[in-house]
A protein has these predicted regions:
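A short acidic, Gly/Pro-enriched loop at the edge of an enzyme's catalytic core
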Residues: 258-267
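Substrate-binding/catalytic lobe of Class I Rossmann-like enzymes that use SAM or dcSAM, i.e.
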Residues: 303-420, 426-428
Length: 428
């Protein structure tokens, strides 16, 4: 990274050293007045943006290639992230960089979640939007979307997840010192919401690698039928269930929830609903209503965007949707509640919001990822992949830390439900 002795430049001086693309980007950056960002230029020198009163070093970007400015002009925030992936800029603290732009989201044009538009930036975002729409989650496309992320390699995910292989936010409290303990607490919280007991048959929509099913059966003695459309996840989940001696209590089915038939006491889904997109969330809520018994309970953990910004998120596309989770969309709590009522007669009974816990979870994953880069390379992943995943983890960490997005556990019930008794205790 640049030396602290690099001379400070005025906006005019910094613009003079580059072409039109640089000038356009610097002009937009000059409008951002929250936090602090120092931009170091390829020819030397730096320019500061944000508030002079902001404490600490703030965020820092070292531009290595003038093409970084061109990407930003053409693709706005997606161009910024793609420039990092291609090595055109670097930073010692990616979360701080993303955090700077989130602090200024109302003044940052043409980004997901922002209502501000600027004709000078984002000329190619329409192409990104069309590409995103083409990844809508019908049955065939849903399998392809899931495979692109979750079927990368089970060994890859082992490198940075804890032993439970939970790839969702943990819940941290005064009793959770490690990521594994915090993931156990997340699972416990869902079990408590569901009042799970030995007589329950639980439907899980989205198996992951079997971590929640293993926890639920080993602590509550229930039965679990778990649905997944990822062959790689299914294979490892079945292997882990067999090793735990619980194959008689847990069935993992390679099946789309829309095709499943059955009748269940309880339903759980952990960070799967975001993958559905706007169009297919109603089908999920209808399926839950169809598959749950009249006195059934449903507990979901899902990632949220602010209700007031949902339409902006829905009509946009960001780095995560283009490069990490194609076809996905963060959820509005209000919309989920309305659809659960409309499609299944449910009402929201309890809601826990723990967004900062996800920032801490992502930081733990990012640290483990960096500590195991040799293992990532040994699996055949190149430096571009490493930079993309490094950015993904820190990008999401910043979004949760700045409360731009959140994560909730929500319990849904139908009215007059006697199943809402005190939470069950873990099995002895």
């Amino acid at each position: 990274m640049p030396e602290s002795t690099a001379p400070a430049l005025s906006l005019e001086q910094a613009a003079r050293g580059g072409g039109m693309m640089r000038r356009l980007v610097l002009r937009e950056l000059a409008l951002l007045d929250q936090g602090r960002l120092r931009l170091f230029l390829p020819e030397g020198g730096h320019i500061a943006f944000g508030s002079p009163a902001a404490g600490g070093p703030g965020a820092m970007i070292q531009v290595k290639d003038e093409n970084a400015f061109r990407r930003i002009v053409l693709s706005a925030d997606i161009g910024l992230t793609e420039g990092y992936i291609e090595g055109e800029w670097d930073s010692p603290d990616l979360a701080a960089v993303i955090g700077f732009f989130l602090e200024n989201i109302e003044r940052t044009p043409n980004v997901s979640g922002s209502g501000r538009k600027a004709l000078a930036l984002g000329a190619l975002r329409i192409a990104d939007r069309i590409g995103h729409l083409l990844r809508s989650n019908d049955r065939a496309t849903a399998r392809r979307n899931i495979a692109e992320h979750y079927d990368l390699s089970n060994d890859f995910f082992r490198l940075f997840l804890d032993p439970s292989m939970m790839y969702s936010s943990a819940r941290w409290n005064g009793h959770t010192a490690t990521l594994e303990e915090a993931q156990r607490e997340k699972n416990e919280a869902l079990c408590r919401h569901l009042r799970l007991g030995p007589s329950d048959h639980l439907l899980e929509i989205g198996t992951g690698w079997g971590g929640f099913a293993l926890h639920a059966v080993s602590t509550r003695g229930c039965r679990v039928t778990s649905l997944t459309i990822s062959p790689a996840q299914r294979d490892l989940a079945v292997e882990r269930i067999r090793a735990a001696g619980l194959s008689d209590r847990i069935e993992v089915r390679l099946e789309d929830f829309r095709d499943h038939r059955g009748s269940y006491d309880k339903c759980v889904s952990i960070e799967m609903m975001e993958a559905l997109g706007h169009r297919y969330l109603p089908a999920f809520c209808s399926a839950v209503g169809r598959l749950l018994k009249p006195n059934g309970l449903a507990a979901f953990q899902y990632i949220t965007c602010p209700d007031a910004r949902y339409e902006q998120f829905r009509k946009g596309v960001d780095f995560i949707q283009k490069h990490i989770f194609p076809g996905s969309l963060l959820l509005s709590v209000n919309r989920v509640n309305a659809l659960m009522t409309e499609k299944g007669g449910f009402q929201l009974h309890a809601l826990d919001d723990f967004g900062p816990d996800y920032a801490r979870t992502l930081d733990a994953w990012a640290q483990a990822f960096e500590a195991n880069l040799a293992g990532v390379r040994a699996l055949g992943f190149d430096e571009r992949f490493i930079r993309k995943w490094r950015l993904y983890l820190r990008y999401c960490e910043a979004a949760f830390a700045h409360r731009n997005i959140g994560v909730v556990q929500a319990l849904y019930t139908r009215p007059n439900n006697p199943a809402l008794n005190p939470p069950c205790s873990p099995a002895a």
